[in-house]
Amino acid sequence: MGKILGIDLGTTNSCMAVIEGGKPTVIPNAEGGRTTPSVVGFSKKGDKLVGQVAKRQMIANPGNSVSSIKRHIGEGDYKVNLSGKDYTPQEVSAMILRKLKDDAEAYLGETITQTVITVPAYFNDSQRQATKDAGQIAGLEVLRIINEPTAASLAYGLDKEEGDHKILVYDLGGGTFDVSILELGDGVFEVLSTSGNTHLGGDDFDQRITEFLVEEFKKAEGIDLSNDKAALQRLNDAAEKAKIELSGVASTNVNLPFITADSNGQPKHIDIDITRAQFEKMTEDLVAKTLESMKMALSDAKLTTKDIDRVLLIGGSTRTPAVYNLVKNFIGKDPYKNINPDEAVAVGAAIQAGVLSGEVHDVLLLDVTPLTMGIETLGGVATPLIERNTTIPVKKSQIFSTAADSQPSVEIHILQGERGIASANKTLGRFVLDGIPPAPRGLPQIEVTFDIDSNGILHVNAKDLGTGKEQSISIQKPGGLSDEEIERMVKDAELHAEEDKARKEEVETRNNADSLVNAAENTLKEAGDVATNEQKEQIEAAIADLKTALEGEDLEAIKSKTEALQESVYKVSAAMYEKAQKEASAGAEASEDASGPSSTGSASDDDVVDADYEVVDEDK
């Protein structure tokens, strides 16, 4: 069995790790970074860019770049236009996953086909399925989807086998937030509860700074930058840097020269100071939202802050002092610092991958479903079948009946959420069980079964116990993709892979041809009388042919003209080398003649005489 890659597919950055020698190891990307920006873009030439190179071009080419796509995964109608083509969040995420896969293969020297991917604990069914679809599009078999806080606890608790620990994992990433409470003991990791917000993260903190800068600039210059894409991208980058700097210093300066120009063409600049106090004031409501989730998680787990043994902070945004202090003051304990908040989730994913591959032993992960799942019943009521924070995998059944006499069919409306009214919850899917024999209302027995697998993905079955007729569905919700769509996207991804390969081949072919032209021209200059006039003319003609080919788009013509020039140059280069050897040999013989007589005949071993010698000091 090959390596199984553990992937933290993050909103802002992604990270990957594998088990090597029984221990999790973070794999650097092709650029040498231990995390990869979750950014995708296309250059002005149409080349696909992923990671750091895509992030670098966002300021100059914001219309052909996308970041934080994770915030939209699972949204069925959402698409982003890049280089004139619409892409779903799954396709964009697949590009990021594909880069991670390719970089891991280059680092490990072996093919990677399987993965464990992490998601926020509060991701719903459609978001989980969409993440799994993204992996499939990227050419990866997703063996398991696990929750990010759970993965972080695996990273923390791998070597802590003695005694029971109750830990609170506070995960504030780039675009999502959740908090989970787990119990660790004897290699068993059991999730007791989870709560959170899939649309709250570091991006929102950055946005508050961006809005502040836009407003301050408008006051000073009377110019609104909110509709200037290029300026906004520069502001967003500056806001992120300011947020990071304010984690370590009391104030920072945002200086952006030539941010725009006024109506007279006069350039305008931004030069604004931001204090940590200002930043904390503009983001205090965001921090407060996370407190409510912590309270809910504790309540669901039937615990108090005194029951928590350890606090783990995950995600780069937890470095913000206001966040750190909130958690510390609420729980009454200093958060555990011996864990890298940017890498812990990927390390945990690698550990779970190691469990699946048999490389890691004596670890059992008991995760939970974050939201209640049920169906709509008479009167628009949401009837739960599986309550939130139920350990998964889980399978539960309940008997329902018809609402009207002689009702021939029933619609199963599948819901996810905590509201008692069906319309207030999220619809995961619908299907119809028909063929019910005529009978008075309440008499037919319809058994509805909910089955949540180890990835947290739901499968529903409805069966008429009287006739044995049944209907089932693996939820293909608004954010999910059909098998046909996934297959099309896989082929599309493969097509792009071929395009990328072809583009790379073209660049290398042209570079080789250019280098050869330069080398051939130098050879002509240095050849002198070694090359005949005919050979020189042949090389000059071959150079001209190759230059003409390089001006066109025919790659095969470039290759053939390159080969022709190589052949012409080779003959002259060989003659030049032979001449150089002769000159070197003649020089060596002249040197020997000058130093004394030498034997002109060949000597056999019998003619060789071993001589004693004595060193003579001529100064004596």
Swiss-Prot record:
InterPro entries, per the entry: ATPase_NBD, Chaperone_DnaK, Heat_shock_70_CS, HSP70_C_sf, HSP70_peptide-bd_sf, Hsp_70_fam
Keyword Cell wall biogenesis/degradation included in the entry's annotation: no
PROSITE patterns: HSP70_1 (PS00297), HSP70_2 (PS00329)
Compositional bias annotation for Low complexity: 583-603
Record field: compositional bias (Acidic residues): 604-620
Highest taxon of source: Archaea
Residue ranges, annotated region (Disordered): 579-620
Regions that span the bilayer: none
Keyword annotations: ATP-binding, Chaperone, Nucleotide-binding
A GO molecular-function annotation: ATP binding
Family from the record: Belongs to the heat shock protein 70 family.
Its job: Acts as a chaperone.
PANTHER family: HEAT SHOCK PROTEIN 70KDA
Entry-linked NCBIfam families: PRK00290.1, prok_dnaK
Name under which the protein is recorded: Chaperone protein DnaK
Gene source species: Methanococcoides burtonii (strain DSM 6242 / NBRC 107633 / OCM 468 / ACE-M)
